[in-house]
Amino acid sequence: MGLMWGLFSVIIASAAQLSLGFAASHLPPMTHLWDFIAALLAFGLDARILLLGLLGYLLSVFCWYKTLHKLALSKAYALLSMSYVLVWIASMVLPGWEGTFSLKALLGVACIMSGLMLIFLPTTKQRY
């Protein structure tokens, strides 16, 4: 059950990260504070996506809290690295994100996935 909550947390946090990235690229920069505030108060699509991203992070924290009650911290914390993989893949697949593929990034993803496999593979008891 803890693994399920952890995966929910990772998926929701990844979607929230993508939402915040979209909002940040479409809203005025915070260096133009009054324009930024005006865009938030207009509550257009960009502001709503920003709010969804923030609410997504809040929901992700709730799922993470549930994860930590059911799963060892050493395993739970390793799950967070899945978010890097999901966001990288989504940035290449989703239109408008212009994520780039590189062998270096693929090697990083392979390292992350290998590490997760090592952590989550069942251990066998050795007999002496």
From Swiss-Prot:
Matches recorded under Gene3D superfamilies: 1.10.3730.20
Principal location listed in the UniProt entry: membrane
Complex and partners: Heterodimer of ArnE and ArnF.
Purpose: Translocates 4-amino-4-deoxy-L-arabinose-phosphoundecaprenol (alpha-L-Ara4N-phosphoundecaprenol) from the cytoplasmic to the periplasmic side of the inner membrane.
Taxonomic superkingdom: Bacteria
Segments in the Periplasmic topological domain: 24-35, 98-100
Cytoplasmic side: 1-2, 57-76, 122-128
HAMAP family, sorted: Flippase_ArnF (MF_00538)
Recorded GO MF terms: carbohydrate derivative transmembrane transporter activity
Membrane topology classification: Multi-pass membrane protein
Residues annotated as transmembrane: 3-23, 36-56, 77-97, 101-121
Presence of the UniProt keyword Membrane in the record: yes
Pathway recorded for this protein: Bacterial outer membrane biogenesis; lipopolysaccharide biosynthesis
The encoding gene: arnF
Stated name of the protein: Probable 4-amino-4-deoxy-L-arabinose-phosphoundecaprenol flippase subunit ArnF
